[in-house]
A protein has these predicted regions:
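Conserved catalytic core of the tyrosine transesterase superfamily
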Residues: 1-313
Length: 313
């Protein structure tokens, strides 16, 4: 209430030229409100101006409803837009702590713990920038290998918009190790093949869900959120999630790491699947190189141990 009283008093002071006690309904006009808020804006931040505007808008709405004002003048008084906060990324120490935490589940006897899958989930978010719903919708057939041992993930994004995100051999190895562990957990659910040398990707139907839960079915949003949340909780103070962006924080980290590698806004827009270059501009303003080489620069690749196994402490 104190803030509302201050907002009322500040504008009343400006409208009455320093004599707020003399304010009458007749003083509340479009012009007086515009001039008062213009003066108020010179010494206050956008958030304060918007709160003050809301205070006076409620008052004028009340007076208009009570037929004491012919119209609400605040509808003709502009208010500033709040700048969107810059996306926050996880520091590298947090990423390392998360990966180490997932590794601790390697020898767990609990069926809910699945280190290979959780590592693949986390690294796909960190190294391919997939949203939570994109991780859920991903199929095994969406990953297509290249001649040099790397791969491309074909992502089904927002509004049916698709994009292709290149990934390096290190991440592909992590995903393949997860698929191998999945075949052990759920025998008979993949393709029947006698070729033991075949890629783990080829041993699953193309339309089979890439990430599954403990029941072998496509992973749910709840399971995805809970596994990431659990990793953050167990990683301790060195790994705090991005406020309000548990899984999305992995995507923010992907974008921020690439931005720090001098990737162009256009390239980042393609990799993230943004509709507008303005959204990508929030991450980077420098010019860069082509998509594949840009994605390959992500420093998180250096945190993946060789062989696709989860990192050890």
């Amino acid at each position: 209430m104190k803030a509302y009283r201050q907002d009322f008093a500040a504008i009343a002071f400006l409208v009455t030229e320093g004599k707020p006690a003399r304010l009458t309904v007749a003083d509340i006009t479009k012009d007086s409100m515009r001039h008062a808020f213009a003066a108020y804006a010179r010494d206050h931040e956008a958030a304060s101006i918007r709160r003050c505007w809301s205070t006076w808008n409620m008052l004028c709405t009340f007076l208009y409803t009570g037929e004491q004002l012919a119209a609400n003048p605040m509808q003709l008084v502009g208010r500033p837009k709040l700048a969107k906060p810059l996306p926050k990324a996880l520091p590298r120490t947090a990423v390392e702590a998360l990966l180490e935490t997932v590794a601790e589940d390697q020898d767990s006897k609990h069926r809910t713990d699945w280190a290979e899958r959780d590592l693949a989930l986390m690294l796909t978010g960190l190294l391919a920038g997939l949203r939570a719903e994109e991780l859920q919708r991903a199929d095994v057939g969406d990953i297509r290998t290249t001649d040099d041992g790397a791969a491309v993930i074909h992502v089904k994004g927002k509004g049916g918009k698709e994009r292709s995100v290149p990934i390096e051999a290190e991440l592909l190895s992590v995903i393949e190790a997860y698929l191998d562990s999945r075949a052990i957990r759920f025998p008979g659910t993949g393709k029947r093949t006698t070729n033991t040398a075949a890629s783990p990707l080829s041993q699953w139907p193309a339309r089979s869900a890439l990430f599954v839960g403990r029941d072998g079915e496509r992973i749910t949003r709840g399971t995805l959120q809970s596994r990431i949340k659990r990793a953050f909780k167990r990683a301790g103070p060195d790994a705090q999630p991005v406020p309000g962006a548990l899984v999305h924080g992995l995507r923010h980290t992907y974008a921020t790491e690439l931005a720090g590698s001098d990737v162009s806004v256009y390239t980042l827009m393609k990799l993230l699947g943004h509709e507008s270059m303005t959204t990508s501009q929030r991450y980077v303003s420098a010019a860069g190189a082509e998509t594949r080489s840009a994605a390959a620069r992500n420093p998180i690749y250096a945190m993946i141990p060789t062989g696709g196994e989860a990192p050890a402490n």
